Amino acid sequence: MEKLTILLLVAAVLMSTQALIQSDGEKRQQAKINFLSXRKSTAESWWEGECKGWSVYCSWDWECCSGECTRYYCELW
């Protein structure tokens, strides 16, 4: 009887551990989906004024939609 009780206790601990791990994995997957769906296309970023288009004055690469600031002007992809 004692062995059966211990066996049931171990089984309960293993099942609850598995449930915790599975729940954490689902949360990570959902966070990944949310992150990827929140990204905007280059056209959307340009339209909303979050980046500069081609041949516009710039100082840094990150200012341009193309990501290329050459000689103070945004490059065309």
Swiss-Prot record:
Proregion span(s): 20-38
Major place of residence: secreted
Disulfide bonds: C51-C65, C58-C69, C64-C74
InterPro entries the record matches: Conotoxin
GO molecular function: ion channel inhibitor activity; toxin activity
UniProt superkingdom: Eukaryota
Keywords from the named record: Cleavage on pair of basic residues, Disulfide bond, Knottin, Neurotoxin, Secreted, Signal, Toxin
GO CC aspect terms: extracellular region
Tissues/organs with expression: Expressed by the venom duct.
Region forming the signal peptide: 1-19
Localization per record: Secreted
Domain remarks: The presence of a 'disulfide through disulfide knot' structurally defines this protein as a knottin. The cysteine framework is VI/VII (C-C-CC-C-C).
Family: Belongs to the conotoxin O2 superfamily.
Name the record gives this protein: Conotoxin Bt6.6
Organism: Conus betulinus (Beech cone)
